Amino acid sequence: MSQSGKNGLTYSDAGVDIDAGNLLVEKIKPAVRSTRRPGADGEIGGFGGLFDLKAAGFTDPVLVAANDGVGTKLKIAIDADYHDTVGIDLVAMCVNDLVVQGAEPLFFLDYFATGKLDPDQGAAIVGGIAAGCREAGCALIGGETAEMPGMYSDGDYDLAGFAVGAAERGQLLPSGDIAEGDVILGLASSGVHSNGFSLVRKIVDLSGLAWDAPAPFAEGKALGEALLTPTRIYVKPLLKAIRETHAIKALAHITGGGFPENIPRVLPKHLAAEIDLTAVKVPPVFSWLAKTGGVEAKEMLRTFNCGIGMIAVVAAENVDTVKAALEAEGESIVTLGRMIARDEGAAGTVYKGTLDL
């Protein structure tokens, strides 16, 4: 218990525990060190994180930056008291946005805000961030922990992430040669990833299931644990395929808004993506969400990834080469569709077939 000093109140009396913050820093140092890479080998604790771009091996780089959060998936982590994986989600949401532009993630910074700092909880979260950074090959070079009593309810917290990467000038994606007839490949997701969780939570509430109840769609797992499956990080397989095949014309990260909102972002205005919905292998979690919530297929497709977390556009003659390169790195690939002509004012994504929910 804190005590007021002779001259009145202390910061601790106001709800901010500096000692807890210092303890958290000591707890996370080994995890942070584990993310070191060429260009970043400093310790945390300075006023700013350092990165040596020349040491990373670039000659004429263009920097690419992205920031994101985890959204209301955090509420499940908080309610289920399971904090080990949301840091992976945080990194994934940022670095996947970098790689779609052909950039290699270099470094990452996080912002962790809470009403009352729990060093063990914070260490679990940052441990997940470090795990995500290792998987993406980027260094965790700094961050901010903000204890803000009165801003958040007890136990609540929020996360934001910031990633910076680089690509050699002239190698950024999308390329300028996307053409009618090019093939769209879909890379499988690991689950819901980090979008649509306000709807997920509404459906779970309607189901009457508790977070520790057996997941109806994942044998041997509790509902909360299954829904917290971390977002897949596609960085290393995609970078390897980009560099080995020189055949990937465009990539799109399928996040909030699904196919119709994300694929057109990387396409020229005169082309649309024709998606064959029968090619999508819908994971059981999405079937359960659709049936339990009575969610129509159209709404599922504009809210969730529905089993495809990333798409790649390649020329038809390069499909086998790119698929082989990605499958060699453990990715599950489907031929999802093709590029077609698009009339002015028409939708950038059109469907054929139906989604097997």
Swiss-Prot record:
Keyword Transmembrane assigned: no
Any one GO CC term of the record: cytosol
Pathways per UniProt: Purine metabolism; IMP biosynthesis via de novo pathway; 5-amino-1-(5-phospho-D-ribosyl)imidazole from N(2)-formyl-N(1)-(5-phospho-D-ribosyl)glycinamide: step 2/2
A molecular function GO annotation: phosphoribosylformylglycinamidine cyclo-ligase activity
EC number of the protein: 6.3.3.1
Gene Ontology biological process: 'de novo' IMP biosynthetic process; adenine biosynthetic process
Keywords: ATP-binding, Cytoplasm, Ligase, Nucleotide-binding, Purine biosynthesis
Cellular localization per UniProt: Cytoplasm
Catalytic activity: 2-formamido-N(1)-(5-O-phospho-beta-D-ribosyl)acetamidine + ATP = 5-amino-1-(5-phospho-beta-D-ribosyl)imidazole + ADP + phosphate + H(+)
Entry superkingdom: Bacteria
Family note: Belongs to the AIR synthase family.
Name of the featured protein: Phosphoribosylformylglycinamidine cyclo-ligase
